[in-house]
């Protein structure tokens, strides 16, 4: 039996994740009081369900504090347990609530939206450490859907999934990064007018960067560091390791580096590549990721 648990901050996109899992054939349970988690799993296992997705969050009230202990108990009950924790920056969450005109579950006439978000973040801090964290700040709903589909694919495979994620420092460091490397010291193709509209996946940018010796040296240093420590992360029984590569705008250098590294590890572990900021060159500001 495979269980996928979904938790996270209100407004981070949990309902989108559940819809993707439901479309993929999972039996979905939303807004389950965390105190009923073990009882639900026992019932569904007895009924013959093989793939189940359950959302547990602050709507469970104070019982959410017991979730870490329940998750540990659950690990001994099922063959495969995966946990996704969705989060986003405060400014992103505020913008989403403003756009959708929904009320935060912890907000009322005496508690502002800012304060409600902080209270929820504090209350879920221990829950966030239980599984794979996804930072949905500044992304489209379709991008989140693709991420969840990647996660489902990783859940179907054994062992660790290594994720290389490019980003732009001017948009903030991804909240879900395990390792962060800064490549802003490398020459920037942005200042070449012909390369400015391209990304690090385009051949012109690749040729530009591969002519610079420092680029190759830094790429090899990062590769060696990840390779040296990857066995330790694998021994820790992690499902995901997210390596974030950042440049100024997340369009050229970091994209190139993430792609380069992904190719070097593709024959060792399952590899996923995400580019958080590169799409900004052709997209307007993304719409809110609606959902809980």
From Swiss-Prot:
Binding of GTP, residues: 57-60
Binding-site list for ATP: 8-15
Pfam families xref list: PapZ_C, RapZ-like_N
Annotated GO MF terms: ATP binding; GTP binding
Domain of life: Bacteria
Name the UniProt record assigns to this protein: Nucleotide-binding protein azo0399
Function of the protein: Displays ATPase and GTPase activities.
Coiled-coil features, chain-numbered ranges: none
Keywords carried by this UniProt record: ATP-binding, GTP-binding, Nucleotide-binding
Family, similarity comment: Belongs to the RapZ-like family.
SUPFAM superfamilies with a match to the protein in the record: P-loop containing nucleoside triphosphate hydrolases (SSF52540)
Cysteines engaged in disulfide bonds, as pairs: none
InterPro entries membership: P-loop_NTPase (IPR027417), RapZ-like (IPR005337), RapZ-like_N (IPR053930), RapZ_C (IPR053931)
